[in-house]
UniProtKB/Swiss-Prot annotation:
Native source organism of the sequence: Medicago truncatula (Barrel medic)
Domain of life: Eukaryota
Similarity comment text for this entry: Belongs to the cyclic nucleotide-gated cation channel (TC 1.A.1.5) family.
InterPro entries (UniProt xref): cNMP-bd_dom (IPR000595), cNMP-bd_dom_sf (IPR018490), Ion_trans_dom (IPR005821), K_chnl_volt-dep_EAG/ELK/ERG (IPR003938), RmlC-like_jellyroll (IPR014710)
PROSITE patterns: CNMP_BINDING_3 (PS50042), IQ (PS50096)
Record lineage: Eukaryota, Viridiplantae, Streptophyta, Embryophyta, Tracheophyta
Expression sites by tissue: Expressed in roots, stems, leaves, flowers and pods.
General function of this protein: Cyclic nucleotide-gated channel involved in the establishment of both rhizobial and mycorrhizal associations. Required for full activation of nuclear-localized Ca(2+) oscillations by Nod and Myc factors. Simultaneous activation of the K(+)-permeable channel DMI1 and the Ca(2+) channel CNGC15 can give rise to sustained Ca(2+) oscillations. May function during fertilization in both female and male gametophytic Ca(2+) signaling.
Protein's name according to its UniProt entry: Protein CNGC15c
Compartments where found: Nucleus membrane
Length: 703
């Protein structure tokens, strides 16, 4: 085969011709040694040129579905999996539902007049004609769309990816063999032709049969229109997974189908009521055979003299009353009693709709039939249809509505199981209350949605984008990470997991191994230390949104040769309020530190020291100890100066009294030198407050 585009285009070339090498459209022959022999026959050369031009102008017949975008402007054929077809299917589904609602309204065209005749409502006739004609346009457009919609070749599905057939003739032949005639019948304007062409040509007694003709044509076309909804819904479900996007829309859709069935049943009951009323008139007419004709029940003849004379002399109005007992109206007695057949359109429509809905819901239990077989069959259909449709409605409504409350019910069941387990294990009331509080807060925060399970079902690229959107600003808010490159931040974000804490929960206690770093989203934590339980030592701080804790793990992870044993916490961290955070476990932090060597940068030393609570505590204690040492040394120096001054004055006085002034000067010098030596030996033994042990210095050097 010859290929213009090896991936997206396919031509049905002659295999033998495609194997012959050509140069500028001329066949090329070669000697045994490889030298070229030009073609001698100009006639054959022209023949080959013509053949090659023909091959280049061949119509594109097939294309792989993923390559359709490249050739769609050239072939003018629609992709059955494209967005345009999906959007049109939804529009056409709505148009089909509207048409199914409009067609039964033609049953309301016959109207019973007070003159005991049947007429056609002209205003309703015009309105229904316009609406029905507009709806028929969608069926015509659907036929045109199918003539221009490619299909997947069945033989190509074996190889895993289907090829779209783009040849117009093949598409048309396939459509003619599958579904065209059904679409054609559904698109025919049968009711319009019936009420504007056929019925006006009828005269006399044939007008009485208008109801039968109308009922036959409407039902004849209604069945294929109703059938078209099911494959159309299947196509939408196959393309998008669901017909409706939300559970409430799905429940409303099923309820609408149930109301549509009530609408159809009410319209049929109205038309059959008129037929039963006309049957009563005919029964009276048979009794008055010499003066009555069936043509008198046509409102076109109410001004005829024989008809006027018959109406004056006849007792048809009294005999055909439901209370007269002359004729068994059966299930249609309500229409006669309420005068539905002669009421304005909206009055009779809503009454008939209510009749259909009431009997469908009650499975026809309130229907009191006569002995007419046709009437009994109608009652059987109502009961059977009501049973099936009501069961479908309840089932579908339950399915859609349960999708809303299923997580709530699961949470309630889980809460019940938790209560039973706590009772079985005889947990103390305080512990039970803490468990209840945590479960309640988890439900409020997540609504039963397991975020990690949702993310696991998504592709890696989408997971990365979602984590980046949720966590990037939070991670950047940590000063220790704000200067890292994007790849490093993405690696950290990918490994963050959501965490929840209720008020009073201890995240970690002093001396326990640190398993994770926490990045706070909302809420506050209390972090404090007693320096291993030392008397008189207490240091605390408040951690809020944007802060982090568990920095001991960072020192452990930054070590090129970290120990298997996790570091111990130097602080106790307790939830001051309900806290939502992201957690980075030890193994993930170790992986990030080992993969990205830029984390081992000396530029991070000062940031790590400044924002680490452990280093802050050590620095504060170190400064306090240094200040205390300085203060004590200063006080000791002042005290020694005073003591020296007093001792010197006393010694001078004693020497002066005993030996004179010369010995005073010499004694003073000896005393000063002696005290100076004593001070030099005793100055280093002054009391010093031992400082807090210095934290382990992280190794930022590259391996």
């Amino acid at each position: 085969m010859g290929f213009d585009n090896p991936r997206s285009e396919r031509f049905e070339d002659d295999p033998e011709i495609s194997k012959i090498p050509t140069t500028s459209g001329v066949k090329v022959k070669y000697h045994i040694d490889g030298t070229q022999i030009p073609e001698q026959s100009s006639k054959k050369s022209r023949k080959n040129e013509t053949r090659n031009k023909f091959l280049k102008t061949r119509v594109l017949s097939r294309v792989f579905s993923e390559d359709y975008e490249r050739v769609k402007k050239r072939v003018l054929v629609l992709d059955p999996r494209g967005q345009l077809i999906h959007r049109w299917n939804k529009i056409f589904l709505v148009a089909c539902l509207v048409s199914l609602f409009v067609d039964p309204l033609f049953f309301y065209l016959p109207v019973v007049r007070e003159e005991v005749c049947i007429d056609i409502g002209k205003t309703l006739e015009v309105i229904l004609t316009v609406v029905r004609s507009f709806g028929d346009l969608f069926y015509i457009v659907q036929i045109c769309m199918k003539f221009r919609t490619a299909y997947v070749a069945p033989s190509s599905k074996v190889f895993g990816r289907g090829e779209l057939v783009l040849t117009y003739s093949k598409i048309a032949l396939r459509y003619f063999s599958k579904g065209f005639w059904l679409d054609f019948i559904a698109a025919l304007p049968l009711p319009q032709v019936l009420i504007w062409i056929i019925i006006p040509t009828l005269r006399g007694s044939t007008m009485a049969n208008t109801k039968n003709v109308l009922r036959f044509f409407i039902i004849f076309q209604y069945i294929p229109r109703l059938y078209l909804i099911f494959p159309l819904s299947s196509q939408i479900v196959k393309a998008t997974g669901v017909v409706t996007e939300t559970a409430w829309a799905g429940a409303a859709y099923n309820l609408m189908l149930y109301m549509l069935a009530s609408h159809i049943l009410g319209a049929c009951w109205y038309l059959l009521s008129i037929e039963r009323q006309e049957a009563c008139w005919k029964s009276v007419c048979n009794m008055e055979k010499s003066n009555c004709q069936y043509g008198f029940f046509n409102c076109h003849s109410i001004k005829d003299a024989p008809r006027v004379a018959w109406f004056i002399a006849s007792n048809v109005t009294n005999l055909c009353s439901p209370n007269a007992g002359f004729y068994p109206f059966g299930i249609y007695a309500d229409a006669m009693t309420s005068k539905v057949t002669s009421s304005p359109f909206f009055n009779k429509y809503f009454y008939c709709l209510w009749w259909g809905l009431r009997n469908l819901s009650s499975l026809g239990q309130g229907l009191l039939t006569s002995t007419f077989i046709g009437e009994i069959m109608v009652a059987i259909v109502v009961a059977t249809l009501g049973l099936v449709l009501f069961a479908l409605l309840i089932g579908n409504m339950q399915t859609y509505l349960q999708s809303i409350t299923v997580r709530l019910e699961e949470w309630r069941v889980k809460r019940t199981d938790t209560e039973q387990w706590m009772h079985h294990r005889q947990l103390p009331p305080e512990l039970r209350e803490s468990i209840r509080k945590y479960n309640q807060y988890k439900w409020v925060a997540t609504r039963g949605v397991e975020e990690e399970d949702l993310l696991k079902g998504l592709p890696l690229d989408l997971r990365r984008e979602i984590k980046r959107h949720l966590c990037l600003e939070l991670v950047r808010g940590v000063p220790l990470f704000d200067q890292m490159d994007e790849r490093m931040l993405d690696a950290i974000c990918e490994r963050l997991k959501p965490a929840l804490c209720t008020e009073g929960t201890y995240l970690v206690r002093e001396g326990d191994p640190v398993n994770e770093m926490l990045f706070i989203i909302r809420g506050h934590l209390d972090s404090y230390t007693t320096n291993g339980g030392r008397d008189g030592f207490f240091n605390s701080c408040r951690i809020g949104p944007g802060d982090f804790c568990g920095e001991e793990l960072l020192t452990w992870a930054l070590d090129p040769r970290p120990s298997v044993i996790l570091p111990s916490s130097t602080r106790t961290v307790k939830a001051f309020s309900e806290v939502e955070a992201f957690a980075l476990i030890a193994e993930d932090l170790k992986f990030v530190a080992s993969q990205f060597r830029r984390l081992h940068s000396k530029q991070l030393r000062h940031k790590f020291r400044f924002y680490s609570h452990q280093w802050r505590t050590w620095a504060a204690c170190f400064i306090q100890a240094a200040w205390r040492r300085h203060k004590k040394r200063k006080e000791a120096a002042e005290l020694r100066a005073k003591e020296n001054l007093v001792a010197a004055s006393e010694a001078e006085n004693e020497i002066a009294k005993k030996y004179g002034k010369g010995f005073v000067v010499y004694g003073t010098r000896v005393a000063r030198s002696t005290r100076k030596g004593v001070n030099m030996h005793s100055g280093t033994n002054s009391g010093v407050v031992s400082s807090l042990q210095k934290p382990t210095e992280p190794d930022f050097s590259d391996e």
